[in-house]
Amino acid sequence: MPSELKVLHIVLVLLYTLSSSTYNSNGNWTLEGSAADNSIGDTILTNTKKHSCGQTFNNESIPIKDSSFSFHFLFGIVPEHTQSGSHGMSFVISPTAGLPGASSDQYLGLFNETTNGKSSNHVIAIELDIQKDQEFGDIDDNHVAMVMRLSIVYSHPDQQLNVTLFPAEIPVPPRKPLLSLNRDLSPYFLEEMYYGYTASTGSIGAFHYMLSSYATPKVENPTWEFIVVPTLPPYPKKSSDRTKKILAVCLTLAVFAVFVASGICFVFYTRHKKVKEVLEEWEIQYGPHRFAYKELLNATKDFKEKQLLGKGGFGQVFKGTLPGSNAEIAVKRTSHDSRQGMSEFLAEISTIGRLRHPNLVRLLGYCRHKENLYLVYDFTPNGSLDKYLDRNENQERLTWEQRFKIIKDVASALLHLHQEWVQIIIHRDIKPANVLIDHEMNARIGDFGLAKLYDQGLDPQTSRVAGTFGYIAPELLRTGRATTSTDVYAFGLVMLEVVCGRRMIERRAPENEEVLVDWILELWESGKLFDAAEESIRQEQNRGEIELLLKLGLLCAHHTELIRPNMSAVMQILNGVSQLPDNLLDVVRAENLRGMPETSIEVLLGLNLYSVGTMTLTNSFLSHGR
């Protein structure tokens, strides 16, 4: 078995005892197969040759039928490998002085596939097997004859066969045998038979040594003091094999080293190529800090999927943490098929990068790598406003105070973009998804990917229709021109959604409530405007502010551009500096300015004159919608 194969020299003793004579092992022996005598008189049954077998038989027959006998023998096994053995050897009693046609491997030089298992063979053998063969029903893989002496004693009167094992260094065998068999062996024997030894190898070589034998006329366990256990030579190692192994190992190590070196060079090359950046001339004029692409890779963990915050037509947004400062950031990466290209990218970094307002998402910097464009913003942990509009039972509902503040924050940001900064900026994509909420529940406008920059005093109109369906003003669809008034239209819809706690289009709502603007106007006309607010905030102490925002939202979302107020007027109403007149419902109902009562026109004039100062009536109507 494997643990005992660690002992290279396996030595046992064979002594043969017969009732009629004493037999000397130096008598006439026949050698077959790989068997050969060595220089010291021992018989070597097998050697380094694989899948071979050897036999040695005494040429003198012995009378054995109806007789008692004892066999004791000394042999040694030196396997090729210390952790695994070959197949083993056997002591055999045969009708002939040899077993022609025997096979190697598991057949041990005794039989072959045809002769194995036939009782007519009259072959009796004791296996000294060092490998378990399931097909022959081996009792286990701890085989006898590996590191022990073996005595085989058969008493014909008692019809008992005993097999005893004990260490080679002990001269006296133990009294208790390892195996005992009560059976009459006479039917298996002929009158005259021969005895000998066989051995075989498989895919692993082994030296099987037959060392000595003799006979005595009685059944007994003799003493072994006169037996000298020889020292067997180790299994030979061919220098050529050793050289081949050394060369193979060296070659393998050399190939591995070349492979590793090539891999390292490739990684460094691709990594360098991956993070290599080119600075264009147009980038010099823009103020925001340019981030190294490698820095963004580290911050976003190579833009892993688990860092993804969202994806839209503009591209993807990833969460990241800047190394060193541990500041949380949001990185917007434009996708290859994004609607946002270089022109929009330049517009964004040229505008928001210079803007500083508490209700605008701060642009920290940008990066450009290959075909991708990156914008780095402050991270807003509470996400976007749209998630608070979903009627999900698990979603925390906003209080009225939070809603009112969010509306004022968005209005303040738009006022800054439209009128307070040195240049007029049209956002063009105001919607709940672009209103981000920070950790203190402050609202900030983000995603300036569709923003357009114009010098103050020039015609602030564009020819490209952009935005999100549902939030696009009617005139923008007709003319394709975006103005500050189109931003006001979208803001009015957002205001109504925040107060009502729902989307402007609700397919699951009753038919008369599907379109938010129409439903609110219907409630207002029936004197139930307060019922449009979300139930969780519908408290009497909030009635005045709720109805104010609903009316203002309808005014801002009016389908006629000239009827909408500008953001300056909106902020004054929200701050209580200005009030909406009582007859505002007539203004909201009006299709256009023609045919509108004079008092209603005066209402519009009043709203817009707050923001345009000393402008004339005509200029007021022309300029409020920038």
From Swiss-Prot:
Residues 22-212 are annotated as: Legume-lectin like. Residues 1-21 form the signal peptide. Its main location: membrane. In the C-terminal section; belongs to the protein kinase superfamily. Ser/Thr protein kinase family. In the N-terminal section; belongs to the leguminous lectin family. The gene is LECRK58. It comes from the Eukaryota. GO terms for molecular function: ATP binding; carbohydrate binding; protein serine kinase activity; protein serine/threonine kinase activity. ATP binds at L309, G310, K311, G312, G313, F314, G315, Q316, V317, K332. This is Putative L-type lectin-domain containing receptor kinase V.8. The chain crosses the membrane at residues 246-266. Residues 303-562 form the Protein kinase domain. Residues 22-245 are extracellular. The active site is at D429 (proton acceptor). The keyword Zinc does not apply. It catalyses: L-seryl-[protein] + ATP = O-phospho-L-seryl-[protein] + ADP + H(+); L-threonyl-[protein] + ATP = O-phospho-L-threonyl-[protein] + ADP + H(+). One of its GO terms (cellular component) is plasma membrane.
